[in-house]
Amino acid sequence: MKKIIILSISALFTQIAIAQKQELDSLKNIQLNQVVISGNKFAEKKKNIVQKIDVISQKEIAQMNAQNTADVLTNTGQVFVQKSQQGGGSPVIRGFEASRIQLNIDGIRMNNAIYRSGHLQNIITVDNNSIEQLEVLNGPASTIHGSDALGGVIVLKTKDPKFGKSKRLELTGANALMRYSTANQEKTGNIGIHLGTNKFASYTNITFSDFGDLVQGKNGVDSIMKLWKKPFIVARVNNTDTMLANTDPYKQVSTGYKQLDILQKFSFTPTKNIRHGVNIQYSNSSNIPRYDRLSETAAGIAKNATWYYGPQTRTLLAYQFDAFDLKGFFNDVTATLSHQFVNESRHNRGYKKAALNHRDEKINVLGYNVAFRHKDNKHELTIGTDGQLNNLKSTAFKEDIVTGLETKIDTRYPDGKNNMYLFGLFAQHTLKLDNGKVVINDGLRFNYNTLHSTLLDTSIQFQLPFSDLKQKNKSLTGNLGVAYMPSSDLRMTLNYSTGFRSPNFDDMTKVFESVSGQRLIVPNVNLKPEITQNFEAGFQYNDGKLELNAYGFYTLLKNAIVTDKFTFNGKDSAFYDGQLTAVYASQNKSKAFIYGGGISFIYRPMNHFSLSGSTNYTFGRYNSDSILIPLDHIPPVTGRLGIKYDHKKWYGEFYSIYNGKKGLIDYNPNGEDNIQYSTPSGTPSWFTVNFRAGFFVEKHTQMQLGVENILDKNYRYFASGMSAAGRNLIIAVRYNF
């Protein structure tokens, strides 16, 4: 009897061990054969791309339950995100931010000619509920993606329509979401519907979100919390601006906003190797208050009564043609024609001032890209061309809120014609040797960019000494890298790549008050393109049970565009908006460098359980008169730790996100680090403890629960003008089939 029991127990443990090994092997195979699209315009196994790519799946996005796409990136622990207002989120990749990284949606470049060098919120115009896969390509990627890809590229792939099995139109899939969060009284609803036949398919996705004012944490250092509380609000009382006490100083009044996102895609396959697609996207928001500007005071008196972004509108209409498994030299072809329209505006009024300033920017972007791929056992060759034409209309006026009188004021960008054209030819090659153990990536790109702006009224335009601005730039960029995989467990990489960024309207032509009454940025027509050289090494180990990744990089930046002191009409200061203000401008500095590295791991001690962690470090300086000065946008040490159970029926995770201290000595003195919103010693280090879980109540319906910042810590991300959320309870219901 004892032998039978012992044999039974032994057999049971053997089966468990076999099952565990099979699951771990399955996970390993999935990771090894993971497909990405950011590397060369076509679907490619991640292991064949030398450059570091972080991939976030649709399942991971759903489990995160993030309120927007910027928060998805924050939750990974791999990407730092800055916020000046709740309706924002500006990713930083390897010390580059805003116009120095590229956003790409469904193969279409989102960056336009007014992507600024400071902080952006454009990524939140992409609904994370519509994303199928998100990829972060780390380091210069100009060979394939062109200008602006200095720090990297964020590739957003939206969900494709699902085809049916017959000629009859049928429901082929659906998704829905309802979510409530307590820290900002978030109310989000989402619905998506797939309809299809065997040749035609449609996908419609609609999301609406209502975000209230964000409440910050109540636990922290008293002296810091005093700085970051909002003790007042500004209201009109008897037609006069009045400072009133904020009844809840932890509530960051004037941070709430609303947003609507719509995605509509059609797909048609007349034959098995031809596909036509139409992609329609629309995103719009309510007014988005600039909380950082509304919290500013001078001698205890509010500086601004009103400061908000108007509704941020983004539309995209694109046609895509794909042909695959073709006979002849080229096996695959993809081509896209697109039109994008973006409307942004800024509205501000000083405290107890009657003049409400309105500045509006409308930009239309026509674009195309065409790529051809050849594949054989050893070689893959992708060649192609892409281009964009940007047309900008910038207008401005001042409204007297008492009399209603409207008068012209200086526009943010030139008030005449503004055109920017980007053109590129590229080739990317992959060579596989020794049965795929050695993979070589090499590529080359030719860039040609032009910019032309005219000023119609130079008297209103801040009395600028010129009326016509022109620039033409050419460049060659490339990459060369090798991946060596001596076994299925081990992978080592070396990579060299160059990046290129041509100055846009925001760099060359804007008039902008960066810090109220302290710093005025004026145009500089003598800017040159920024050029980077990047050296990178990587190490990956994955035996199914332990996955370990480490990397290091060194980037040389030539002609780095930084904000520094300047003279305008021979003077170092000028009157702007009624105040004598120091003059600054974007300028090329001869040299800059950024280096850093990171390590991440996932350890799976048994089926369904995993321990994970990551940490990243970045350091950057530029040379000014033989003095090394900190570059702006360089985040502190960042990272994440987590323990997770993930079963097909339910999952649960405890995790912590942390940031190191950013001391004042490491702040850029003139750039976009927002030193005025930090503490006397800089940005303190912090960590949060968080929990999330989900379980299926039936096959297609999932309940989700989360508690973020369980300890209710009061903290702020580096360079951010508002504090992060305090303790936040999240309740959600999802439906998918």
Residue ranges and their predicted role:
Residues 21, 253-259, 269-330, 341-363, ...:
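Flexible loop and strand-edge segments within Gram-negative outer membrane beta-barrel domains
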Residues 21-62, 98:
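Short, acidic, small-residue-rich periplasmic hinge/interaction motif at the N-terminus
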Residues 110-140:
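Short acidic/polar hinge/loop motifs at secondary-structure boundaries
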Residues 184-210, 221-287, 313-315, 432-434, ...:
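Transmembrane beta-barrel wall of Gram-negative outer-membrane proteins
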Residues 286, 341-345, 398-405, 448-461, ...:
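Surface-exposed extracellular loop regions of Gram-negative outer-membrane beta-barrel proteins
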Residues 365-371, 422-424, 522-528, 534, ...:
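Outer membrane beta-barrel strand-and-loop segments of large Gram-negative receptors
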Residues 381-491, 512-515, 626:
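Signature of Gram-negative outer-membrane beta-barrel scaffolds
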Residues 434-435, 449, 553-556, 576-667, ...:
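Gram-negative outer-membrane beta-barrel transporters
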